Amino acid sequence: MLTLGLESSCDETACALVDADAQIVANVVSSQQYHASYGGVVPELASRAHLQMLPSVVNSALEKSGVSLDDIDLIAVTHTPGLIGSLAVGVNFAKGLAIGSQKPMIGVNHVEAHLYAAYMEAKNVEFPALGLVMSGAHTSMFLMEDPLSYKLIGNTRDDAIGETFDKVGRFLGLPYPGGALIEMMASQGCEESYPFSAAKVPGYDLSFSGLKTAVLYAIKGNNSNSRSPLPDLSQKEKNNIAASFQKAAFMTIAQKLPKIIKNFSCRSILVGGGVANNKYFQTLLQNTLNLPLYFPSSKLCTDNAAMIAGLGRELFLSRKTTQGITPCARYRWESVADSLSPHP
């Protein structure tokens, strides 16, 4: 069975092929670089770029794998959550491929696919597992009874962790996206230089907006007027701010996990999303949690279509098909509270 996956939920246009053994045959990603000049993703520009790039990334994936569309058995496409225009372009393109080739099609949840990316490369994952997604748009924790079961435990109440990194990067004068650059600067700074901390939210939820504001005030000092320009800082000061911020942001997440693991009897942890590629965070969890940890490889942390094809294949084989595939910007997961699961 050969599955073709399509991903277009934000600013990456991607196509991948996964075979019957869930092995990646081809994985092509086209990133839209011009959003950097705007300091973030411009939805209309992203949609137009997907429309332009989808045919070429599909052709490239087919060429790399040495197959044609006739050899494809299933088409999987991201349909939620994400930028509605970008999702619509991907879903409609997938529908055209499915109709033209007379192949079955299945819709895939982008966030769930990030967790499946870790599962794809792991061996003998024990369930129930804690699923942690950390990206530019999401910071969510899930109870996973199996690879296809996702019940929401906790969520960010404001900014996502990746979004917070990008905004702090902007404060430090870094180009968009700023996450990887902050990690690099932090490795050269002192994480004890600034006593940053995020808001302590009751229960399992998270909050990063206060931490972001604290960093801004630390940079501006006494001149904290919102309209005042950001001062020039030495590279040493920037490195120290980056290190202190990074520690505070990740400790906020890490401190929530032991209670979740205990209350929901989690036997392993799956982590996904672009921020999961941060080596400081990986080391932090490895040093503080006594459970098997599974992170995707770097190529599967950021948005890609291999995770879409992999999860789509699994859903199809499990007969968990999507009826009436339509793009949807937001998605509401069943909560553990809905199932009367343990509360903090």
UniProtKB/Swiss-Prot annotation:
It is found in: Cytoplasm. One of its GO terms (cellular component) is cytoplasm. Keywords: Acyltransferase, Cytoplasm, Iron, Metal-binding, Transferase, tRNA processing. Its cofactor is Fe(2+). One of its GO terms (molecular function) is iron ion binding. It catalyses: L-threonylcarbamoyladenylate + adenosine(37) in tRNA = N(6)-L-threonylcarbamoyladenosine(37) in tRNA + AMP + H(+). It is an enzyme of class 2 (transferase). It comes from the Bacteria. Fe cation binds at H110, H114, D303. Binds 1 Fe(2+) ion per subunit. One of its GO terms (biological process) is tRNA threonylcarbamoyladenosine modification. Its main location: cytoplasm. Substrate binds at V133, M134, S135, G136, A137, D166, G179, N278. SUPFAM superfamilies: Actin-like ATPase domain (SSF53067). Its EC number is 2.3.1.234. InterPro entries: ATPase_NBD (IPR043129), Gcp-like_dom (IPR000905), KAE1/TsaD (IPR017861), TsaD (IPR022450). Belongs to the KAE1 / TsaD family. Required for the formation of a threonylcarbamoyl group on adenosine at position 37 (t(6)A37) in tRNAs that read codons beginning with adenine. Is involved in the transfer of the threonylcarbamoyl moiety of threonylcarbamoyl-AMP (TC-AMP) to the N6 group of A37, together with TsaE and TsaB. TsaD likely plays a direct catalytic role in this reaction. This is tRNA N6-adenosine threonylcarbamoyltransferase. It comes from Chlamydia felis (strain Fe/C-56) (Chlamydophila felis).
